[in-house]
Amino acid sequence: DGRTPALRLRF
């Protein structure tokens, strides 16, 4: 995913 490190845990 190309999202933030924190949100990567969920998304």
Swiss-Prot record:
Species of origin: Penaeus monodon (Giant tiger prawn)
Keywords: Amidation, Neuropeptide, Secreted
Coiled coil: none
Biological process per Gene Ontology, one example term: neuropeptide signaling pathway
Family: Belongs to the FARP (FMRFamide related peptide) family.
Keyword Secreted: yes
Subcellular location: Secreted
Residues modified to Phenylalanine amide: F11
Name used for this protein in its record: FMRFamide-like neuropeptide FLP6
A single GO cellular-component term on record: extracellular region
Record bears the keyword NADP: no
